[in-house]
Amino acid sequence: IFFRDQKITPREQINFAQRFGEIHFHPYMKGLDDHPEILEIIKEPGDGYTFGSVWHTDQMFNPQPAKATMLYAHEVPKTGGDTMFSNQYLAYETLSEPMRDMLNNVKTFNVGDGFRRGIGKAKRIDRYAKNPTMQAKIRDPGNIPTEAVHPLIRTHPETKRKSLYIGSHTQTLDGFNAEEADSIIDFLRNHSQRHEFTCRFRWEAGSIALWDNRCVQHKALADYDEKRRTHRITIAGEIPM
């Protein structure tokens, strides 16, 4: 869901987000000092790393991932900085029946740090070295779980539709050797990003995007070199089934 021309305070953003459920806190990233529910995502001119620039669903490395995300734009570049979204219902439904049958009971192992498909094995703090503003927000997750096993094919608790549940946090597949798992994951990640499944949102200051992580992947485009500042809130979800 997208909204244009909004003017809301941090407190109003939190109040709106809470209509959809309990606020989910990022285990690795500190929120605003006065509103810790909000993660401020900033890229300054010259920064070489864009937060969220690979296809993913938020907090997939948590045993109870965020079910939804709300992003509010404060400052945006004149061009670029769009966000891509991909429909994972369609990603599942367009797989062949034999492929769906093979994958229906497969589990994925997902990690929050030290490994991301499309980026490599660098630790989060090292990946953010080219974006010192975001690097300064990194914290130790402490006892918060940052590894999780999830079904590869997820059933939405409200719509009851099945979707492909995979992303850059997915490290391997239970029951498959490394070569098999890598081949299947690479195929599914490429399949999940097919052009016909996607839409592209062009940000303006005052825009809000609200999406369901249980059936949607997203990706921030790293095609700009101006300041971009957004406020993100994630909503706590249930254990994927």
Predicted regions and their residues:
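Fe(II)/2-oxoglutarate oxygenase catalytic core
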Residues: 3-210, 214-241
